[in-house]
Structure formats: C-alpha cells, structure tokens
Amino acid sequence: MGELAVQKNLIQQGYGIYVPVVDSKQVDLIVELNNGSMKRVQIKTVTELKRGTAVEVSLTKYKNTNRIDVVAVYYMPDDIIAYVPYENTHALSLALKTSKNNQTKNRKWFYSYEHFPEFS
C-alpha cells in the first residue's frame, strides 16, 4: 500500500520513478531528479503513532550500508508521506502532534518533509 502511495505522489510531484524488478538490495524505488541524478528510496509504511505523537521507523539494517538516499514514510491513517534524506541513523522519528511536555528541541516535524528533497 505504501509503495503505491509513494509512487503516485512522486509522479504528481513531476518526478520520473523506476521500480526494481527484484526486491533484494533494500531499494524500493529510484527517483530521477530534475537535474538528472538518481536517488534510491526505501519506503516505510506506518499504521499507528508511537506514544501518540510521532511516527517512528527502524532503519537499523540500512545503517552503514550506503544503499539508500531517502526514506519515504507513508502514514496510512492520514494518507500522508514524508521524504527524509537518510543520514545513516538507526531510527527516524517524525512528530505529527505536539508532545505532552511541549518539547520542540531536536524534534523533526513530519510536515516539513512533504516534498521530495532536491539534492545538489
């Protein structure tokens, strides 16, 4: 479900997309940017919020592999997608709601990543 939602959204944003025939290298799709470069995307589908405020995904198996450039997070209940440049981390947390203690420092907001990143 998430892969189709991401493909549709990227086409709507005007990108060319390519889907691997075999899912063996941790890449769900490849996006051709406006400058002609290609970016490898891993898609994660999330069905519920952790602690009621944030979408969280584990990325442990991608750390230090140099296999992906962007993580696309599809939050199914709201039918929304975030495109986060992969920074070689073991997990990703994107806030959808304000936390109970109103913490904002070092918090990444889901809606800040609605457009696919253009790399230089």
Regions found by a protein language model. Give the residues of each.
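Mixed-charge (Asp/Glu-Lys/Arg
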Residues: M1-K25, I30-S120
